[in-house]
Amino acid sequence: MGLTFTKLFSRLFAKKEMRILMVGLDAAGKTTILYKLKLGEIVTTIPTIGFNVETVEYKNISFTVWDVGGQDKIRPLWRHYFQNTQGLIFVVDSNDRERVVEARDELHRMLNEDELRDAVLLVFANKQDLPNAMNAAEITDKLGLHSLRQRHWYIQSTCATSGEGLYEGLDWLSNNIANKA
């Protein structure tokens, strides 16, 4: 009886660990999001050449978040981070109408990779504070998310600088990764 209670207690209260890969085109806001989640503040960023990795603690979950640079020359390196990824965060600059097709192409190219077949997808429609930003429904359409029949996905409107929407996204991610486990 005591052992059963101990097992139940540890299952309920043990810290869960999740490996998250955060990608998107350059200047979408990935690094700003990472450090807003990690430190709760805005940091001055420069274009990421390579990656940043941080552990973000949230609601008894330890997210290891890999923020990988999005410049076109280094996107082929994304695949080196796919292994063991449970959740994929794809960050989109909602204000960048010129490159939303490029973002869609990169997203679908990635989702076709075998190593990511079981990863859940969270799209952060970032920069919602800008006046000409596309809303989540428009980005869903432009990214072709409804065509992802075999993939569990969700889109969350965000503003990295204020933190708006970030934790709602993490809630969805943690619930959906936990449900797959």
From Swiss-Prot:
Lipidation (N-myristoyl glycine): G2
InterPro entries xref list: Arf1-5-like, P-loop_NTPase, Small_GTP-bd, Small_GTPase_ARF, Small_GTPase_ARF/SAR
Gene3D superfamilies on file: P-loop containing nucleotide triphosphate hydrolases
Single annotated GO MF: GTP binding
Protein name: ADP-ribosylation factor 2
Gene: ARF
One protein family per Pfam: Arf
Family classification: Belongs to the small GTPase superfamily. Arf family.
UniProt keyword annotation of Nucleotide-binding present: yes
Keywords, comma-separated and alphabetical: ER-Golgi transport, Golgi apparatus, GTP-binding, Lipoprotein, Myristate, Nucleotide-binding, Protein transport, Transport
Any Gene Ontology biological process: intracellular protein transport
Annotated localization: Golgi apparatus
Domain of life: Eukaryota
